[in-house]
Amino acid sequence: MNKLIDFSKGLVPVILQHAQTDSVLMLGYMNEEAYQKTLKEKKVTFFSRSKQRLWTKGETSGHFQHVESIHLDCDQDAILIKVMPQGPTCHTGSLSCFNSEIESRFKIQALAQTIHQSAKANQSNSYTQYLLKEGIEKISKKFGEEAFEVVIGAIKHNREEVINETADVMYHLFVLLHSLDIPFSEVEQVLAHRHQKRNNFKGERKEVREW
């Protein structure tokens, strides 16, 4: 395929796409050397325009992008690489770098980013910082309390209460994940893997590991 790509015109844009979920992960650029290195090592390497050198994605964080397949567009001037990410793609801890939509609805990844930012900010009135300073036992207790509130609302068939308490559960879940240094992208990867499975009936004794 490299014979079809004309690198003489400059850097070629490269889109990374999750091989299982088809989510668009990030945009980078390659010169011929970066492309050849990617082919050889099966890990995505870009040419960094800011550093002016080859840059293997994950070389610092360990969050490598493992190549599954490579595709060329019809004009032969852009590349799509389907990858299996080894951890989050974005430096913010998100699975994808494309999270800042214009006039978009709220998405769950934004909650993880907000908690990540709140944890780093120096705000004395931050509830997120309060929970993190109190530690995992406090966070786990709050998570359990909010989950129980969902159960109570469900038993009462109180739709509004279930919705509101579920939002509280999600917030405390993400604080818990942050406190344990677990990026939500790892949860997404497990969900994506299980989504590929079918007819995983639990039965009477078998523990649920796949849906």
Curated annotation (Swiss-Prot):
Enzyme Commission number(s): 3.5.4.19, 3.6.1.31
Region (Phosphoribosyl-ATP pyrophosphohydrolase): 108-211
Family the entry assigns: In the N-terminal section; belongs to the PRA-CH family.
Keyword Nucleotide-binding: yes
Localization terms from the record: Cytoplasm
Region ranges (Phosphoribosyl-AMP cyclohydrolase): 1-107
BP GO terms, sorted: L-histidine biosynthetic process
Enzyme class, broadest EC rank: hydrolase
Alphabetical keyword list: Amino-acid biosynthesis, ATP-binding, Cytoplasm, Histidine biosynthesis, Hydrolase, Multifunctional enzyme, Nucleotide-binding
Chief subcellular location: cytoplasm
Catalytic activity entry: 1-(5-phospho-beta-D-ribosyl)-ATP + H2O = 1-(5-phospho-beta-D-ribosyl)-5'-AMP + diphosphate + H(+); 1-(5-phospho-beta-D-ribosyl)-5'-AMP + H2O = 1-(5-phospho-beta-D-ribosyl)-5-[(5-phospho-beta-D-ribosylamino)methylideneamino]imidazole-4-carboxamide
Annotated metabolic or biological route of this protein: Amino-acid biosynthesis; L-histidine biosynthesis; L-histidine from 5-phospho-alpha-D-ribose 1-diphosphate: step 2/9; Amino-acid biosynthesis; L-histidine biosynthesis; L-histidine from 5-phospho-alpha-D-ribose 1-diphosphate: step 3/9
Any one cellular-component term (Gene Ontology): cytoplasm
GO molecular function: ATP binding; phosphoribosyl-AMP cyclohydrolase activity; phosphoribosyl-ATP diphosphatase activity
Species name: Staphylococcus epidermidis (strain ATCC 35984 / DSM 28319 / BCRC 17069 / CCUG 31568 / BM 3577 / RP62A)
Matching Pfam families: PRA-CH (PF01502), PRA-PH (PF01503)
Superkingdom of origin: Bacteria
Protein name: Histidine biosynthesis bifunctional protein HisIE
